[in-house]
Amino acid sequence: MGLVAAVGILHVAFMVAEVGFWTTLVPKLKIYGEAQAAATAEVGKNMGAYNGIFGLLLLWLAWKAPELGARPARAFATSLLAGVVVAGVVGGLTIRWTIPVFQSVPALIALATLWSASESPKR
């Protein structure tokens, strides 16, 4: 669950950046100019809210996984990480091509690690 927590931390950081620093960060990253950044600030806050939800749920899951048990924790992690992958792909198609690199790729690595480390089914 370590990589699940890492993806959670990334998404909390995305939330802070999108909610608190959209109008200054977006022009510096050359995503939009200053006028467009100001005009899309509310959209940035909305994106930040969703990233925060993903981040906090992933962090909660990493913390509570031992209590949930391996199979339920893995199922919940898979659902959340798949949502992160989809959100990253959509962001890459609609906003900027780098979004999947920073959002989907870490989630895919966490998914691959999660599933490769899981027990093989008993026959």
Model-derived segments and their meaning:
Residues 20, 63-64, 93-97, 116-117:
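Helix-loop junctions at the membrane-solvent interface of multi-pass transporters
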